[in-house]
């Protein structure tokens, strides 16, 4: 799911990729020629020449407005400004936030002039959810603060209220989203609702569960009653709003909420088991907690390459499969060669597929790295820890590389002409071919063992489906 800015103008994203990039300089490469499109409820600022893309954004924004206005029983009197960018690389160049914006931050909304800023290089379902999320913040600013920024700063509802409500309005949680709350339930670490310090990505998931529980117990009007009482409570005190909306104390709410969570997740845990029941974890260093993502086994099966953030930087490391121990860091010292590695859940939001690929002989790995205005394909010698090739492309937002069995090609997903397709690059000549060239969102390519076909994931009708080309 995408990271977003909170109602206070501060950005709440998973700690794995949030704080690391703040303070870094923002560089503007393009000079966009902005135009304005007026729809019933929006002033939409755009520069794209793709009329179909513009109309899609307009349609999604108006549909999201209709959905939220009915849910909240509230109308916004003036048009909302929506500024959209064709890609995240373009979105990073906005003038609203002075700091560099990492790819883990998907969009943001501001309470000053009720404006939404977002990129649109994603699948249609994700784009609609993103617009729903940011527009929920706009509704919050109007409903809770009455358009009064001073009141919003003074009230300052907890992050979980602002982000949890916006996440809840998006719709169903993913399995990964549920994992955060399930882990808190199993380890008895569910915080009280009056605890203001709940932040990071957990604030999104915790808040989602709170609003889900409200609707489960008090129906759709429960959330509306809570919003009304929170607006009328001095200082945005959640506990007082709970008492007025539901007639129970915050302590009673917490107890019932925890009981509901335990019934939901502990039964699920008994059915599925714990991670340790299925295997031993890979650890870079004993006693140090770190995230490891995009694991891929070497052709021999002796090693696993993965992204890790155990030393602050995000690196590609090798683990020995036999004893699950750290073997070596492949990218240590390469910070000056690129801005960061393209690693889902670490430097960017979750998408699909893996972000590392082994060559058939096991001597090289391929991944994408951010450099200047775009991404480059990096081919790294595993033995010498040296970059063999670094390839710039006209294709943008590349991710999920896959190496062909003969070693001559690398397939990947990338953005070109307003959509994501599967591309293939010749590792010797650098020539690139668009393999799909269709109107759906394509990602996660994988070569068949004989190299004669590629299996990929396409988002069709809101669902991810497998295809072979």
List PLM regions with ranges:
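Conserved beta-strand position repeated once per blade in WD40 beta-propeller domains
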Residues: 294, 355, 400-402, 444
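Short coil/turn segments at the loop-to-beta-strand junctions that recur within blades
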Residues: 288-291, 333-338, 393-398, 438-443
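Beta-propeller fold detector
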Residues: 326-335, 388-392, 433-436
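Short loop/turn segments that connect beta-strands within beta-propeller blades
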Residues: 320-323, 381-385, 426-430
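Beta/coil-rich, acidic/histidine-enriched accessory regions frequently appended to metallopeptidases
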Residues: 11, 15-18, 25-26, 34-36, ...
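Beta-strand C-termini and the immediately following turn/loop, strongest in propeller blades
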Residues: 305-311, 320, 354-357, 366-372, ...
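Juxtacatalytic substrate-recognition/specificity segment
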Residues: 8-158, 175-177, 195, 237, ...
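Acidic/His/Gly-enriched intrinsically disordered linker/tail segments
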Residues: 100-138, 142-285
């Amino acid at each position: 799911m995408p990271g977003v800015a909170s109602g206070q103008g501060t950005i709440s994203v998973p700690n794995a990729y949030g704080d690391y990039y703040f303070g870094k300089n923002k560089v503007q490469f393009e000079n966009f020629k902005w135009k304005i499109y007026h729809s019933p409820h929006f002033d939409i600022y755009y520069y794209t020449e793709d009329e179909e893309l513009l109309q899609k954004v307009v349609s999604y924004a108006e549909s999201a407005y209709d959905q939220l206005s009915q849910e909240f029983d509230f109308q916004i009197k003036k048009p909302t400004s929506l500024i959209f960018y064709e890609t995240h690389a373009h979105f990073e160049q906005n003038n609203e936030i002075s700091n560099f914006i990492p790819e883990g931050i998907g969009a943001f909304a501001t309470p000053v002039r009720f404006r939404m800023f977002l990129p649109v290089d994603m699948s249609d379902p994700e784009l609609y959810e993103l617009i729903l999320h940011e527009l929920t913040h706009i509704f919050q600013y109007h409903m809770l603060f009455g358009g009064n920024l001073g009141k919003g700063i003074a009230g300052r509802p907890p992050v979980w209220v602002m982000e949890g409500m916006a996440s809840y309005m998006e719709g169903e949680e993913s399995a990964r989203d549920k994992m955060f709350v399930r882990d808190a339930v199993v380890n008895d670490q569910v915080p009280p609702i009056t605890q203001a310090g709940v932040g990071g990505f957990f604030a999104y998931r915790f808040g989602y569960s709170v609003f889900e529980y409200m609707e489960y117990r008090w129906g759709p009007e429960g959330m509306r009653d809570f919003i009304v009482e929170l607006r009328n409570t001095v200082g945005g005190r959640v506990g007082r709003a709970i008492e007025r909306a539901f007639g129970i104390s915050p302590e009673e709410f917490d107890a019932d909420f925890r009981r509901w969570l335990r019934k939901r997740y502990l039964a699920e845990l008994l059915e599925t088991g714990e991670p340790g029941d299925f295997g031993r974890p890979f650890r870079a260093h004993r006693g140090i907690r770190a995230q490891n993502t995009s694991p891929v086994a070497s052709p021999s099966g002796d090693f696993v390459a993965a992204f890790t953030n155990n030393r602050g930087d995000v690196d590609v490391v090798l683990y020995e499969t036999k004893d699950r121990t750290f073997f070596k860091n492949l990218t240590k010292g390469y910070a000056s060669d690129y801005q960061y590695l393209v690693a889902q859940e670490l430097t960017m939001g979750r998408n699909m597929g893996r972000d590392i690929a082994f060559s058939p002989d096991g001597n090289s790995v391929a991944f994408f790295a951010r450099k200047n205005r775009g991404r480059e394909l990096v081919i790294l010698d595993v033995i010498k820890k040296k970059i063999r090739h670094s390839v710039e492309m006209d294709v943008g937002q590349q991710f999920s590389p896959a190496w062909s069995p003969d070693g001559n090609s690398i397939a990947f997903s990338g953005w070109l002409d307003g959509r994501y397709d599967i591309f293939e690059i010749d590792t010797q000549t650098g020539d690139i071919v668009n393999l799909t060239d269709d109107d759906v969102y394509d990602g996660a390519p994988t070569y068949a063992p004989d190299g004669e076909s590629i299996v990929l994931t396409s988002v069709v009708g809101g669902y991810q489906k497998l295809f072979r080309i």
